[in-house]
């Protein structure tokens, strides 16, 4: 078991093969500003580097394109409201470029419903897309956001994006009452 976290850790760590957390008491805190998704991204990047060095990948079995996932890292970074410094700033800047390529069906359909018609920016992530994804969790259906982000076809993504948009409308109605 590998535990990955970003919250400030106490003196006792979970029983696991490894606990990766830049906010452990025995860490220097240089990356304590990262959100959990960014920590996961860095861990996976390190794993891929090690696998490359050991010759695991080849022309017939290439390494996954981790950079194509930076749009998801950017979304998580902005929505977790962590400081936009250091790696966070780099992840968001590059992630917005990836998002502008409109590769992830779920983000494309959600952006379309949310009216993000131009190149995405931090405002779109934090105030238009993020709240729609988070609304499902607030209404007891947190898995819906994950399904959207993992959707592999546009039709499924469109239906999920519509559901999330409806849930966000319901969430706002509840919060206003």
Please give the residue ranges for each predicted region.
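Short capping/connector residues at structural and topological boundaries
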Residues: 13, 18, 25, 39, ...
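Hydrophobic helix-and-loop "lid/oligomerization" segment in the mid-to-C-terminal part
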Residues: 49-177
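Short, glycine/polar-rich helix-capping loops at beta-to-alpha or helix-loop-helix junctions
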Residues: 4-15
